Amino acid sequence: MFFLYTFANEKLALGTMIYHGSIKSILNKEHINEIMKKIVTLAVAAMTAMTVSAQQGEFKTYEGNGFTMHVYYSNDVMADASYIVETKDGLVTIEEPLFKSGVKEFDAYVDKLGKPVTARITDYHEGGTGANSIIQPEGMPKFMHEGVYDAMMKGFQKNFGDKMVDRPTGKAKEVKFGDTQKINGVSYLFVNGPKNDFPAAGILIGKTFYLSHWTPAKAHMNSLQLANRDAVAQALEGLKIAKSYNAKYYLGSHGGVATPDDLDFRIAYLSKIEQLLTENQDATSFVEALKQAYPSLPGEDGLAALAANLYK
């Protein structure tokens, strides 16, 4: 599963460096194309491996205040996670699966719950919502259908072929940051997330679950997640914002469910990176210091590339 985790970070981190404004200026067109090529290559390699021994997805449930959160771990090449918020009045799906095998499992599970789907939320990832209307953070519909994101999805379609669902065609309702949507009695607060993400969206669900692009995993971050030193500070700020909501669980479009302890680990990890950047004058010594600070932490293979970003 670590290969899937690594690939997921490669894919999701594309957005880290193409977010609006100053972040977008970090990369030139050639660099973006290089990253996209790498992402698609990794995806195809992962898909080839998965065809030999495909893993089925799995569901886990967590209790909120008056609702149940169903978490679907797709175990696909993206390591994507999807969610279902269940109340007595109906269901809300969040980040529906992208691949047909996952859509089949997810939809079958929804059918077994025996309640109507009253809303579908697409935060960071397009999925199998088809012609159904969706709810998205402000700016995300436009972002998904132009430029690099659109090209990335078309690249996935070309390489994955009929393993992927068709891209959604339903109408999108945009929610402004700071606004709360109440659906089936559960509140969904759309908030600004980290500036090094796209489009910097977080959703606080029922004051219990906080959804962001990826779960704060106990693993090294990589070169695509942190494009430069500014991104370190921006990611750290975003996690501190997430922590301020005092959620019981922290969700990610990649990675599933994490705890406040996991979040605290990632905050401490980024703080340590900031410290080591001031203490080490070159990339080699930085990598060695980070390894010593976190022995046996997954993701060491990507540290040289990460350091190259931070010392350029």
Residue ranges and their predicted role:
Residues 89-90, 100-143, 246:
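Active-site metal-binding motif and surrounding structural segment of the metallo-beta-lactamase
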Residues 244-249, 256-312:
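Accessory terminal helices/loops
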Residues 56-59, 63, 98, 147-268, 272:
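Metallo-beta-lactamase
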Residues 37-43:
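Sec-dependent signal peptide recognition
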Residues 4-35:
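Short, Lys/Arg-enriched N-terminal segments with co-localized hydrophobic residues
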Residues 45-53:
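Hydrophobic h-region of N-terminal signal peptides that target proteins for export
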